[in-house]
């Protein structure tokens, strides 16, 4: 199925996302340009650092006592006084943008038609520019670890390529020899900001710590540009392409990220040198690259399918916006929309989560803002779970690996959070996580900030995957995560009039009214009780399956 869209897409939200799990881009079409909003899944502000929470076991105990008396107003205020002094997590940042601007002498582009081929993970575009019919393909290859933008034209056109970004600092350009002016390489390098010391409640243009106190990771990107039928000249860090009938732009990023608990590389030139040295070895055969990309993608995409109405072949064009605007009684409208959304959901996860990448975050892998909504972090009170619900039912076992890895990395900070904040053993993770695996509460109201069940709920995803794949080696790999999450949950249980339950408790981002006052902290909540009940059921199931548990683990269940 190929989703098609008529007209330009000047807004990021209207663009076409694509990615290979590690890198991603959104392709937007302006009146005279294509813009690639580029992302690398490891580009975050900050670095590993020690941090403590204002929330303590003593404060939680006071709130528990108040809530047990039915004094939910006091319980909320006790927790609120601490959570409003918390810090927020770090921010997922954009790499920058690559702009391919077409000459305006021929006028604006006309008859623009855009497409997303869900069966091949291929973004497409066609338009008329003067006398030229122009076609664009764009994809991001996992096998070659390259993002590709390919333009072909029926007549010579002029275009320019430029790269910009808030955190980019320097550019290096090398062009072909005088006898070969059809190739150029552009290497950009930048520096992520240091710690975000601001908060979502009070967003400013400069929430960063002073650079004298700390800077973030370095990063670099290499662009290889080749043209057909014309030449490239360099003017002020812009690659001018004159009289070309073909243009091939390839991109690879490299960040200074070394691991969630390791200080990153902060020297831009080290990364630029390392990345620049790889360009000569990049593959040159675009057709072979595309074939490898499609074959790699389809080994995931072809595992399942849904048919609710008439069959759609891979090349069938579905005018998506037109169908959305059509009347409800249009034949097969709902069937087509449902099939498209099923395929699009799988496409997004295949494109944003691969083995050994970072997990798919709040916006997958795509972000164009320096201060994205909710920092585009890992929101564990619903969003990251939703991203991965499909791995089992859609036979995408490999794609859950980043979520498993992240939860393994969260165990140490989760142990610290459980002990220092809640006075419990095991591992507790609050609702916002970043690449540095921050497990502490976020800044703000208890309705979101006081919810230490992020890892416990992610365990549902991890165990659900086992129920589909029945792989005992996989189950053994997630056992320590489930075990330590369960230890925390068991320690946090209290006797209530309805039996054992986590107390005090919230239900994520939910309020209730007592005596005319809107509050968030109750003695118990069905949300947290259900998560604990489910985790303990899953733990017992896992323990009955795994043959080699040690005595301590056997005693737990």
Name each model feature, range by range:
Residues 383, 451-465, 474-491:
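Extended, hydrophobic alpha-helical segments in both membrane/secreted and soluble proteins
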Residues 484, 488-542:
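Acidic/histidine-rich catalytic neighborhood
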Residues 390-391, 459-465, 535-539:
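Buried hydrophobic packing segments
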Residues 1-446, 453, 464-466, 483, ...:
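Aromatic-residue-lined binding/catalytic grooves and analogous aromatic/hydrophobic interfacial grooves
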């Amino acid at each position: 199925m190929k989703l098609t869209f008529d007209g330009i897409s000047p807004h990021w939200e209207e663009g076409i996302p694509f990615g290979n799990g590690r890198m991603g881009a959104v392709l937007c079409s302006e009146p005279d340009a294509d813009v690639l909003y580029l992302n690398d899944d490891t580009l975050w502000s900050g670095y590993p650092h020690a941090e403590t929470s204002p929330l303590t076991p003593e404060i939680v105990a006071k709130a528990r006592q108040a809530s047990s008396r039915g004094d939910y107003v006091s319980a909320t205020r006790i927790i609120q006084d601490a959570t409003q002094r918390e810090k927020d997590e770090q921010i997922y940042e954009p790499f920058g943008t690559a702009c391919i601007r077409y000459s305006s002498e021929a006028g604006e582009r006309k008859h623009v038609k855009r497409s997303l081929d869900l069966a091949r993970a291929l973004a497409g575009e066609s338009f008329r520019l003067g006398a030229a019919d122009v076609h664009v393909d764009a994809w991001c290859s996992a096998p070659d670890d390259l993002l590709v933008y390919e333009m072909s034209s029926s007549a010579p056109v002029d275009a320019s390529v430029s790269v910009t970004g808030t955190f980019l600092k320097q550019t290096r350009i090398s062009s072909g020899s005088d006898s070969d002016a059809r190739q150029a390489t552009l290497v950009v390098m930048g520096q992520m900001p240091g710690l975000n010391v601001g908060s979502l409640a009070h967003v400013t243009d400069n929430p960063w710590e002073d650079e004298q106190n700390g800077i973030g990771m370095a990063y670099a990107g290499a662009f290889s540009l080749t043209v057909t039928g014309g030449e490239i000249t360099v003017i002020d860090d812009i690659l001018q392409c004159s009289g070309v009938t073909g243009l091939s732009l390839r991109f690879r990023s490299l960040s200074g990220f070394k691991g969630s608990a390791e200080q990153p590389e902060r020297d831009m030139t080290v990364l630029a040198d390392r990345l620049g040295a790889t360009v000569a070895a990049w593959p040159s055969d675009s057709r072979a690259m595309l074939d490898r990309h499609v074959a790699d993608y389809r080994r995931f995409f072809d595992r399942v399918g849904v048919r609710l109405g008439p069959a759609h072949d891979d090349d069938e064009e579905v005018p998506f916006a037109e169908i959305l605007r059509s009347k409800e009684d249009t034949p097969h409208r709902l069937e087509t929309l449902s099939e498209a959304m099923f395929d699009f959901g799988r496409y997004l996860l295949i494109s944003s989560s691969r083995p050994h990448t970072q997990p798919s975050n709040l916006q997958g892998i795509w972000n164009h803002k320096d201060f994205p909504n909710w920092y585009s972090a890992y929101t564990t009170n619903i969003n990251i779970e939703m991203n991965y619900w499909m791995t089992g039912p859609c036979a995408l076992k490999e794609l859950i690996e980043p979520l498993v890895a992240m939860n393994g990395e969260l165990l140490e900070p989760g142990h610290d959070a459980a002990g220092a904040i809640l006075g419990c053993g095991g591992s507790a993770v609050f609702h916002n996580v970043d690449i540095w695996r921050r497990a502490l509460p976020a800044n703000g109201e208890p309705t979101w900030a006081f919810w230490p069940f992020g890892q416990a709920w992610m365990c549902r995803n991890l165990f659900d995957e086992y129920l589909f794949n029945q792989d005992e080696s996989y189950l053994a790999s997630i056992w320590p995560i489930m075990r330590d999450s369960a230890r925390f949950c068991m320690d946090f249980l209290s006797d209530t009039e309805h039996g054992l339950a986590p107390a005090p408790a919230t239900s994520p981002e939910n309020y209730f009214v007592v005596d005319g006052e809107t509050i968030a902290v109750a003695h118990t909540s069905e949300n947290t009780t259900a998560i604990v009940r489910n985790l303990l059921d899953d733990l017992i199931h896992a323990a009955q399956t795994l043959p080699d548990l040690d005595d301590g683990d056997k005693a737990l269940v």
